[in-house]
Amino acid sequence: MKTLLLTLVVVTMVCLDLAYTRRCYNQQSSQPKTTKSCPPGENSCYNKQWRDHRGSITERGCGCPKVKPGIKLRCCESEDCNN
């Protein structure tokens, strides 16, 4: 009985870990903070900053995109790390 219970606990832990998704901030510039659960397998968050005629623009989200020259990009791999 103890072996069965231990097996169920281990299986539950493994299944819960497989369903884990990264959470990142996704608000733009100075808008109120919001978060998003990333798609399965997406383990990083990004914070992208640039300047244009409106001033400093910030974009946040899941992943680590490629950017053009002149755009500052910071990628990270912990919960809510891209603020």
From Swiss-Prot:
Keywords: Acetylcholine receptor inhibiting toxin, Disulfide bond, Ion channel impairing toxin, Neurotoxin, Postsynaptic neurotoxin, Secreted, Signal, Toxin. It is found in: Secreted. One of its GO terms (molecular function) is ion channel regulator activity. Gene3D superfamilies: CD59. One of its GO terms (cellular component) is extracellular region. Disulfide bonds join 24-45, 38-62, 64-75, 76-81. The keyword Disulfide bond applies. SUPFAM superfamilies: Snake toxin-like. CDD domains: TFP_snake_toxin (cd00206). Expressed by the venom gland. Its main location: secreted. This is Short neurotoxin C. It comes from the Eukaryota. Belongs to the three-finger toxin family. Short-chain subfamily. Type I alpha-neurotoxin sub-subfamily. Binds to muscle nicotinic acetylcholine receptor (nAChR) and inhibit acetylcholine from binding to the receptor, thereby impairing neuromuscular transmission. It comes from Laticauda colubrina (Yellow-lipped sea krait). Residues 1-21 form the signal peptide. InterPro entries: Snake_3FTx, Snake_toxin-like_sf, Snake_toxin_con_site, Toxin_cobra-type.
